[in-house]
Design a protein with these regions (language model features):
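C-terminal catalytic core of tyrosine-transesterase DNA break-rejoin enzymes
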Residues: 26-37, 125-151
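Basic, Lys/Arg- and aromatic-enriched nucleic-acid-binding interface segment
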Residues: 1-41, 49, 60-64, 84-85, ...
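Active-site/catalytic core of tyrosine-dependent DNA strand-transfer enzymes
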Residues: 1-6, 50, 69-119, 129, ...
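Short, contiguous acidic/charged loop-to-helix segments that flank catalytic cores in large enzymes
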Residues: 12-16, 57-67, 93-99, 117-125, ...
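Conserved tyrosine-mediated DNA breakage-rejoining catalytic core shared by Y-recombinases
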Residues: 31, 36, 40-83, 151-158
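Residues in the recognition helix of alpha-helical DNA-binding motifs
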Residues: 41, 110, 147
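C-terminal secondary-structure termini that scaffold catalytic or DNA-interacting sites
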Residues: 61, 72-76, 80-88, 93-99, ...
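Short, polar N-cap/turn motifs at the start of nucleic acid-interacting alpha helices
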Residues: 45-52, 118-120, 137-161, 182-188
Length: 194
């Protein structure tokens, strides 16, 4: 529900653990990229003039380059992180070594530490959450599926439709980020009233 999403976003933005893990969770919520795409993100993949993240095919499940538009909120998270890890290869380095990405279980552990059980939220759940809410909000299914980097379900459609829907996805992701901010603000008010 939107209320649960608001509580989740409030918990993420107030997470007292590592800056890298908090930032990774924020980017995951804002872009709904897969855990490995986030963990192994490299600074060279980001174009801050075009506000786009170009994930190379070899890092994608479908083995196809993926363009991820970056909202103002995602850019703000990345700017904060750039002061911390900008000189490294990885955007989200391990606290043990700057030359490797953070651990595979770090996001899961952080979500548990914030009080969310396995049946409530897991890292992959950000993708389902975004898809569900964006569909309920009336966004075009093709835009959502392209943002999720899913292969089209109809084989013929997949062969012929190679559209990126970049300007539409850019608008959708900015609206999504604003929507999440609104849900988080509402959750913060509820916490303040308790």
């Amino acid at each position: 529900t939107p209320e649960k999403v608001g509580r989740l976003m409030h918990a993420i933005y107030n997470y007292q653990g590592s800056l890298v893990v908090r930032s990774a969770l924020q980017i995951m919520a804002l872009t709904f990229c897969r855990t490995t795409e986030i963990r192994c993100a490299e600074w060279q993949e980001f174009d801050f003039e075009d506000n786009i993240w170009r994930i190379p095919a070899e890092r994608m499940k479908m083995r196809r380059d993926h363009l991820v538009p970056l909202s103002r909120q995602a850019l703000a998270v990345l700017e904060k992180l750039r002061a911390y890890s900008g000189g490294n290869q990885y955007v989200f380095p391990s606290y043990r070594s700057e030359t490797i990405p953070f651990g595979r279980t770090a996001l899961q552990r952080a979500i548990r530490r914030m009080g969310f059980e396995k049946d409530e939220m897991c890292p992959h759940g950000f993708r389902a959450m975004a898809s569900t809410l964006l569909n309920e909000l009336g966004y075009n299914r093709d835009w959502i599926e392209r943002q999720l980097a899913h292969a089209p379900t109809e084989q013929i459609r997949g062969i012929y439709n190679r559209a990126e829907y970049l300007s539409e996805r850019r608008r959708m992701l900015q609206n999504w980020a604003d929507y999440l901010d609104g849900l988080r603000a509402k959750a913060r008010q509820e916490v303040d009233l308790e």
